[in-house]
Amino acid sequence: LYELANISNSDIKLLINSFNTLADDFDIIIIDTSAGISKNVTSFITSSNETIVITTPEPGALADAYAIIKISREFCDKIHVVVNKADNYKEANRTMEKLSRSAKKFLNMQLNYLGFVLEDETVHKANMEQVAFFVNYPNSLASKCLMDIGRKLVYGEPLLPKTNVTLNNWFTRLESILKAN
């Protein structure tokens, strides 16, 4: 991700062409930009029409999430939130409440809560095995949480709004933003 966060202008065209190829086969592309804000991570955010912010209950993670939300609100139609590594349902909800209160008070905006993923040893175990926890441990707590989030995305409101925004439009916006930086 370091390389992606600091991509050169010469590699931007290659990246955009790769994304354009994907756009022929997929309606949605999710890009994991990791924590923190670099110039090119910000470019991905500003070219998106929706953002899914994934945070943990730790104060530093909440500060990073708030910063992403603050940038995203100017460019995204919707900002979704997932609380990751929560010890329990109450901790996840408290975390979301803190973030929601701050967004409402200081940014005058509502966040869409997609759900939470509980802290689960099978995630660490799967990482050590270099496999997806969802595949090898489909009945784990984390997998069940992920299924709930997936159901909300699939059966709830569509992730991409019903507008004329297409992936090809997005790639064009991304390319112009990255070149400008």
Please report, for each region that a protein language model flagged, where it lies by residue.
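Beta-strand-loop-alpha "switch" segments that mediate conformational coupling across diverse proteins
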Residues: 107-134, 145-148
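Conserved C-terminal guanine-recognition region of P-loop GTPase G domains, centered on the G4
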Residues: 16-19, 62-78
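P-loop/Walker-type NTP enzyme "switch/lid" segment
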Residues: 1-24, 127-129
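Inter-motif core of Ras-like GTPase G domains
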Residues: 16-25, 38-60
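G-domain G4 guanine-recognition motif of GTPases
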Residues: 56-57, 79-94, 116-123, 136-138
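NTP-binding/hydrolysis catalytic cores, primarily Walker-type P-loop NTPases
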Residues: 132-181
